[in-house]
Amino acid sequence: MDGIMTNGSSEAHPPMPPPEPIERPPTPPPPPPEDSALPPPPPDTSAPPPPPEDLPPAPPPETEPKKKKVGWGTKRPAPTPLSVEELVRKKREADAAAAKPKFLSKKEREKLALEKRAQEVAATRRLKSEHASNGVDRSATHSPSVSSEGPNGDARSIPTGPRAMRNSDAAPTAPAAMRHSQSHNKNYDLAPPPPPKSMSFGLTSGKGDSRFVDEDEAAAQAALVKQRYMGADQTSNFSAKKKRKRTTDRKFNFEWNAEEDTSGDYNPLYQHRHETNFFGRGRLAGFGDDVAESVAHKYARALEDRDREAGSIRAREILEMERRRREESTRNQLDKHWSEKKLEHMRERDWRIFKEDFNISTKGGSVPNPMRSWDESNLPKRLMELINRVGYKEPTPIQRAAIPIAMQNRDLIGVAVTGSGKTAAFLLPLLCYIAELPRIDEFEWRKADGPYAIVLAPTRELAQQIEIEAKKFTGPLGFNVVSIVGGHSLEEQAYSLRDGAEIIIATPGRLVDCIERRILVLSQCCYVIMDEADRMIDLGFEEPVNKILDALPVSNEKPDSEDAENPLAMSRHINHDQHRYRQTMMYTATMPTAVERIARKYLRRPAIVTIGSAGEAVDTVEQRVEMIAGEDKRKKRLGDILSSGEFRAPIIVFVNIKRNCDAIAREIKQWGFSSVTLHGSKTQDQREAALASVRNGTTDVLVATDLAGRGIDVPDVSLVVNFNMATSIESYTHRIGRTGRAGKSGVAITFLGNEDADVMYDLKQMLMKSPISRVPEELRKHEAAQSKPTRGFSSKKNNEEGGGGGKVGW
């Protein structure tokens, strides 16, 4: 509006309020002014007239209520002080009302839904108007109809929006610069543009795109974009503790781990794959192997009933297909332990775990799998009844591995620690072998041809122990067993052979005497067992063993070819006769060179079974070593050990020299313990009486040389004391093997001195390998225990017992 001009001058007045559509009452016009009178003053516009009270209410806004302008006509309400009590009361009332459930009727719910929908529509329209104003506001705000001056040329308040948008919805006919060229840059809106909307990568503005990206995925994509343009992170994630994977020729391993893989899909469809639901038990839809097998058998029987000829052929094919399918399905059966599976379901992986559990290792071609129980041994029923009667509940590791091999007529080398059940491991297959041969007492000439089997043992005590164990089975089966050992007259032993014997248990020296004196021949011997072969070599029996093996017939010797590994070929009789191929087995705790030489000469393609590690002590023996020098100090320490009451009888004390046995035995008797001695100078009757007194519990302590270190089975020995350290680590191994037998635990105490420097290194290594033993600091730091000494063969046995021990088996 133009300003009001009076007397050729303009006077600025406050801005007029917007005109109201009010009908004012008619007023009479003022009288005309006189010529000399001054013009009347302008009307006072300081306060507008009050609006009438009967005005109708204003119409509601279409989209949003208009903001009231702050001007001269607004009244500011008087400030009232805040009341804390009122605020607390209102808050409590609001909390109580919110805690109570409020029932809404259907009309109220519809009303709330309509109001919510109206708010959403209003928000959508507001967003659209903001988008449209981003490109139009800057030019539309300079319309000439919007002036910064009032009706009298005075400054006005800043408008709230472009007038073109308030008054007209028509599109402009020309650019704003052409329409308002005079006020082109006047009052230009210098406000910054609104910030852009936050957008996630992968979002589109199309109406039909309903996909969205999660915040984690958007952050991951933003991190990838940042890494692409800002470079890789300088912080290294390398860990020196990370285990490096070894690359082989068949499999290539990268330097990173599986959790460092960045090739995963960001599409949620592939991150959360659908899993198949399995119903019932077994395979999908509840059809297990047992159900499928029963269905296959029913179908096969139906085919056979329908057609005897073609149906039976088709039924066999179906059953074969089902068997193959079952085998294929059991190959991937990894959820059961080998003890829970049937024998036909055992896989190669299960057998490998089984061997690791019992520390079994085998070598040789076509070696059968071990047996898991006596029921899988394929032994005759009569023999199984005897096993149950004797009380063999579970087979030992050497029995599990050796019996299946021996049942296939294979030559065998068994390497096992002492007290592991080797006697039953070779006796049971031996009885099965000779049970298929004719009875030896059938004809007189058969009695004179000698035994079917011979068992060689290094000492008399071990031979008699094997005889006692063998008679538990041979008596009920009707076989005759005879032992030929030194200490008895040849006439007495010849008399025991008058009725013939299927099995002869002998020491090498006495058996050579019988062969040379024509008391015994080996014309039909077809089974040879050498127990404690390394001990026989140590005692100087290598030459007698070779004489015995050379005296065997060559007609039943196995061929040195692949047929020796074929159980079917070795089980056949030779030339349709009753004779069978000779089977040779060797059991030992260590494998010295002489034993390997005998095995290469007389065994044909043998299978090698090793229980544990060769030459190591059993894990059930706790080894203690004490550095004590001098006989008197050792006797005092021995007395303290026996008097402590920690160990119960029987106890074995080993010495190196014969004359020390009686001296130490007298000292033990003075301490109040009963004792007996056992060495090479004792007669056979004295030896048997000494062992019997220890076994029946009448004697507490047995003082012996290395003679009792091999094969002597005294039950429940709780302590072994090495008063003198053995001259070799092999002898030490067999000494401490007298305790901890048959799965029981035991203790071995060794007195060590500077004279035992030759065995200190091997002793330290054995103690370090034992999980329940400890290496003393004196032995660990000793100079002789730091490196293995170089010794000559002549100094291996340089004591009195070694000189006379070679005759113990004669």
From Swiss-Prot:
<keyword id="KW-0347">Helicase</keyword>
<dbReference type="InterPro" id="IPR011545">
    <property type="entry name" value="DEAD/DEAH_box_helicase_dom"/>
</dbReference>
<feature type="domain" description="Helicase C-terminal">
    <location>
        <begin position="620"/>
        <end position="783"/>
    </location>
</feature>
<dbReference type="GO" id="GO:0005634">
    <property type="term" value="C:nucleus"/>
</dbReference>
<feature type="region of interest" description="Disordered">
    <location>
        <begin position="778"/>
        <end position="810"/>
    </location>
</feature>
<comment type="function">
    <text>ATP-dependent RNA helicase involved in mRNA splicing. May destabilize the U1/5'-splice site duplex to permit an effective competition for the 5'-splice site by the U6 snRNA, resulting in the switch between U1 and U6 at the 5'-splice site. May also act to unwind the U4/U6 base-pairing interaction in the U4/U6/U5 snRNP, facilitating the first covalent step of splicing.</text>
</comment>
<dbReference type="GO" id="GO:0005524">
    <property type="term" value="F:ATP binding"/>
</dbReference>
<feature type="compositionally biased region" description="Polar residues">
    <location>
        <begin position="1"/>
        <end position="10"/>
    </location>
</feature>
<dbReference type="Pfam" id="PF25430">
    <property type="entry name" value="DDX23"/>
</dbReference>
<keyword id="KW-0547">Nucleotide-binding</keyword>
<feature type="domain" description="Helicase ATP-binding">
    <location>
        <begin position="403"/>
        <end position="609"/>
    </location>
</feature>
<dbReference type="InterPro" id="IPR014014">
    <property type="entry name" value="RNA_helicase_DEAD_Q_motif"/>
</dbReference>
<feature type="compositionally biased region" description="Pro residues">
    <location>
        <begin position="14"/>
        <end position="62"/>
    </location>
</feature>
<dbReference type="Pfam" id="PF00271">
    <property type="entry name" value="Helicase_C"/>
</dbReference>
<dbReference type="Pfam" id="PF00270">
    <property type="entry name" value="DEAD"/>
</dbReference>
<dbReference type="GO" id="GO:0006397">
    <property type="term" value="P:mRNA processing"/>
</dbReference>
<dbReference type="InterPro" id="IPR000629">
    <property type="entry name" value="RNA-helicase_DEAD-box_CS"/>
</dbReference>
<keyword id="KW-0508">mRNA splicing</keyword>
<feature type="compositionally biased region" description="Basic and acidic residues">
    <location>
        <begin position="86"/>
        <end position="95"/>
    </location>
</feature>
<dbReference type="InterPro" id="IPR001650">
    <property type="entry name" value="Helicase_C-like"/>
</dbReference>
<keyword id="KW-0507">mRNA processing</keyword>
<dbReference type="GO" id="GO:0008380">
    <property type="term" value="P:RNA splicing"/>
</dbReference>
<keyword id="KW-0539">Nucleus</keyword>
<dbReference type="GO" id="GO:0016887">
    <property type="term" value="F:ATP hydrolysis activity"/>
</dbReference>
<dbReference type="GO" id="GO:0003676">
    <property type="term" value="F:nucleic acid binding"/>
</dbReference>
<protein>
    <recommendedName>
        <fullName>Pre-mRNA-splicing ATP-dependent RNA helicase prp28</fullName>
        <ecNumber>3.6.4.13</ecNumber>
    </recommendedName>
</protein>
<dbReference type="GO" id="GO:0003724">
    <property type="term" value="F:RNA helicase activity"/>
</dbReference>
<feature type="compositionally biased region" description="Gly residues">
    <location>
        <begin position="801"/>
        <end position="810"/>
    </location>
</feature>
<dbReference type="GO" id="GO:0005737">
    <property type="term" value="C:cytoplasm"/>
</dbReference>
<comment type="subunit">
    <text>Component of the U5 snRNP complex.</text>
</comment>
<feature type="region of interest" description="Disordered">
    <location>
        <begin position="1"/>
        <end position="210"/>
    </location>
</feature>
<feature type="short sequence motif" description="Q motif">
    <location>
        <begin position="372"/>
        <end position="400"/>
    </location>
</feature>
<feature type="compositionally biased region" description="Basic and acidic residues">
    <location>
        <begin position="105"/>
        <end position="119"/>
    </location>
</feature>
<feature type="short sequence motif" description="DEAD box">
    <location>
        <begin position="531"/>
        <end position="534"/>
    </location>
</feature>
<keyword id="KW-0963">Cytoplasm</keyword>
<dbReference type="InterPro" id="IPR027417">
    <property type="entry name" value="P-loop_NTPase"/>
</dbReference>
<feature type="compositionally biased region" description="Polar residues">
    <location>
        <begin position="141"/>
        <end position="150"/>
    </location>
</feature>
<keyword id="KW-0067">ATP-binding</keyword>
<feature type="binding site">
    <location>
        <begin position="416"/>
        <end position="423"/>
    </location>
    <ligand>
        <name>ATP</name>
    </ligand>
</feature>
<dbReference type="InterPro" id="IPR014001">
    <property type="entry name" value="Helicase_ATP-bd"/>
</dbReference>
<keyword id="KW-0378">Hydrolase</keyword>
<comment type="similarity">
    <text>Belongs to the DEAD box helicase family. DDX23/PRP28 subfamily.</text>
</comment>
